[in-house]
Amino acid sequence: DLTPAQRFEMKVVSAVLPFRVNQYVIDELIDWANIPADPIFQLTFPQRGMLAPEHYARIAELLENDADKAELDAAVAEVRHALNPHPADQMQMNMPLDADGKRIDGLQHKYRETVLFFPSQGQTCHAYCTFCFRWAQFVGDKDLRIASSEARQLHDYLRDHREVTDLLVTGGDPMVMKTRHLRDYLEPLLRPEFDHIQTI
């Protein structure tokens, strides 16, 4: 059993960073006799050290004092921003533009041969890992989220960029999507016009 202190620490951290675990992990993978040292527990349950001491103290104080939702939300937003949710200006620098100069949502073209695609239907995982650097995708803030539900934009971009050989479907676990969504994104890539795409 988790102690009240451990539960509170998790509450503090999960106010800022996403927390999700599934029954299989809880029942089959965690050695509950070895908490908190169990590696799968460490991998999936929020840990106090995930936040800087000053961030932890600020959120803990608000929770202990039953701060109103608006005050807590504002503090959480400030802490998230301080955590640098999108390093290296990836929301600006790596976002490709269409022929009209408009940003194509849900794509990143960071490397010459590789395009990252963030399908909106795949922006979750069965369990969130504590080391995940894509946490901004899961916190419910659409300003932090990179996502697209436009298969056409993906296909148009790949058709126009023959230097791209690799498509990385990411953001969360794409295998949580319904098959029909995954098919809409990937099946057209089997056509000859996409023969430059070698790895998905």
Annotate each language-model stretch with its function.
Residues 1-109:
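Flexible, acidic/Gly-rich N-terminal and inter-domain linker regions that tether
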Residues 43, 99, 148-156:
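Active-site glycine-rich loop that binds ribose-phosphate moieties when present
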Residues 103-120, 141-143:
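Ferredoxin-like iron-sulfur electron-transfer modules
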Residues 118-136:
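Local cysteine-cluster metal-coordination motifs and their immediate loop/turn environment
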Residues 25, 129, 200:
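Conserved, mostly hydrophobic/aromatic
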Residues 133-150, 161-200:
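Core AdoMet radical
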Residues 111-113, 128, 163-168:
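Glycine-rich, often proline-containing surface loops adjacent to acidic residues and nearby aromatics
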